[in-house]
């Protein structure tokens, strides 16, 4: 396989692109829900500890492997150990599956942004609005194809001219928008029909204060698993994306600083997402108002925006534009990972590869978008939930494949290649790898056990 010609221009371009991949829709619709459900500040403390230990280990491994091998997932694992090429193939299949539905979610968000731009905030707050939209045989497909087209156009233009250029302005704007909405949420105040007055500041304290009431060993372990799964999925590890992005990093870039900056950006945005959503929902709906996933973003929050009056339309616009940026940056990285692997496998050029993949995923996105209408199915998943086409793809890729891949990769690096394979790359230019001892312990002993537990829990084997 030929060495890659594409690369990021420097550390800033890489960090912003990688942070864009890590900052996805999960930061907006899952992190706040888990924080509210799992004891507020208690969840935040556990999450931060995991990011600095467990997340750091997996993120460091993926990026270092990518730069050392100068290959995407399939080529990278084959170069490390030819017999482990199968792990590269498994890793490649994760974004292949995710790409079938990520543009659909991006399309939903784009639809809501249009709704707020056109002054239909009150209509979006109606109970049946979201269900009516996703069960339509036309509208979800149109918006999914639009989102997929924008994603493909950016990837088509390459690493520097496409991905890096977009990330350099989109991620700072996203950060500013999140901060603005979070600050506004703290100023909110509302008195409900029963005469109870709640403020945004009270909601913020509810978010920050560790709630240990009724905490048992079983409850603590559940919070730990929730925080671990959120952190794991948030950092874009074990899906080949960071291996691909790592392969674009120049030799003189300090990976130690880069990993730290990616962690800080992703965790910071997740924290601010909680700060902008939890206080707002608390003010208008109390502690019972937090939903998870699509119900939070497309049902609960529109009701909150409607309750804000005229200001709600403007806040809704800012929020859904923020969500578009978060989803688009992740969608770009998913398609880029697939593109890079296909370019290596078939020795094809970028533009031809992207055009073919675009045709495939335009069709796939349309099918998944119609999974709530024409192609509606209900399948009981092993974790006990009932899912449609989108949920099935998400379950297979996120709950089954990613933890399993992470488990195998920690065993490969920790026991077959040995941790020095990654450590040598982290110290390539004479840099001091400060968390070297922590990395050795995590990659060999702690991470494999944690990934096994997460795999058993996410597949429903361990309740």
Residue ranges and their predicted role:
Residues 2-8, 12, 168-328, 332, ...:
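Membrane-embedded translocation segments of transport machinery
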Residues 10-48, 241, 257-260, 264-267:
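Transmembrane helix-boundary motif of multi-pass solute transporters/channels
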Residues 1-2, 106-135, 246-252, 257, ...:
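Helix-loop-helix connectors at the membrane interface of multi-pass transporters/channels
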Residues 34-38, 64, 79-80, 86-95, ...:
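Membrane-water interface regions at transmembrane-helix termini and the short interhelical loops
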Residues 87-90, 346-358, 394-451:
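C-terminal membrane-solvent junction of multi-pass transporters and transport-like membrane proteins
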Residues 1-29, 58-63, 67-79, 85-86, ...:
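Membrane-interface "cap" regions at the ends of multi-pass membrane proteins
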Residues 7, 13-14, 21, 137-142, ...:
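Loop-to-transmembrane helix boundary motifs in multi-pass membrane proteins
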Residues 2-5, 34-38, 71-90, 103-162, ...:
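Inter-helical loop and helix-membrane interface segments of multi-pass membrane transporters/permeases
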């Amino acid at each position: 396989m030929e060495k890659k010609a594409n690369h990021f221009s420097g550390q800033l371009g890489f960090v912003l692109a990688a942070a864009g991949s890590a900052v996805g829709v999960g930061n907006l619709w899952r992190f706040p829900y888990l924080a509210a459900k799992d004891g507020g500040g208690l969840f935040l403390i556990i999450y931060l500890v995991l990011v600095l230990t467990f997340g750091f280990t997996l993120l460091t491994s993926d990026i270092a492997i990518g730069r050392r091998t100068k290959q995407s997932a399939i080529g990278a694992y084959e170069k490390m150990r030819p017999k482990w090429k199968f792990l590269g193939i498994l890793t490649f299949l994760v974004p292949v599956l995710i790409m079938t539905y990520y543009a659909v979610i991006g399309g939903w968000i784009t639809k809501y942004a249009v709704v707020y731009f056109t002054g239909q905030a009150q209509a979006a707050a109606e109970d049946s609005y979201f269900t009516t939209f996703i069960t339509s045989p036309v509208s979800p497909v149109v918006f999914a194809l639009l989102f997929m087209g924008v994603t493909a156009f950016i990837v088509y233009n390459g690493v520097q001219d496409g991905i890096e250029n977009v990330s350099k302005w989109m991620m700072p704007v996203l950060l500013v928008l999140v901060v603005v909405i979070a600050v506004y949420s703290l100023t909110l105040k509302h008195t409900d029909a029963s005469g109870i007055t709640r403020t945004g500041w009270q909601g913020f304290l509810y978010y920050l204060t560790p709630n240990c009431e009724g905490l048992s060993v079983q409850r603590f372990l559940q919070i730990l698993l929730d925080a671990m799964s959120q952190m794991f999925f948030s950092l874009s590890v074990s899906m080949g994306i960071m291996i691909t992005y790592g392969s674009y990093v120049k030799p003189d870039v300090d990976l130690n600083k880069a990993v730290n900056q990616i962690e800080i950006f992703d965790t910071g945005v997740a924290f601010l997402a909680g700060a902008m959503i939890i206080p707002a929902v608390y003010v208008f709906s109390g502690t019972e108002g937090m939903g998870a996933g699509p119900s939070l973003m497309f049902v609960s929050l529109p009701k909150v925006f409607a309750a804000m009056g005229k200001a709600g339309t403007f806040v809704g616009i800012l929020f859904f534009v923020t969500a578009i940026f978060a989803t688009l940056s992740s969608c770009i990285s998913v398609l880029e990972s697939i593109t890079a692997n296909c370019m290596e496998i078939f020795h094809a050029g970028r533009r031809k590869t992207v055009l073919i993949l675009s045709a495939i995923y335009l069709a796939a996105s349309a099918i998944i978008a119609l999974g709530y209408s024409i192609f509606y199915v209900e399948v009981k998943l092993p974790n006990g939930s009932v899912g449609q086409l989108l949920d099935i793809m998400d379950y297979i890729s996120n709950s089954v494949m990613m933890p399993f891949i992470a488990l195998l990769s920690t065993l490969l690096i920790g026991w077959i290649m040995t941790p020095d394979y990654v450590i040598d790359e982290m110290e390539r230019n004479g840099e001091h790898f400060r968390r070297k001892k922590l990395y050795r312990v995590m990659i060999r002993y702690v991470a494999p056990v944690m990934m096994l537990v997460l795999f058993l829990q996410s597949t429903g084997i361990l309740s």
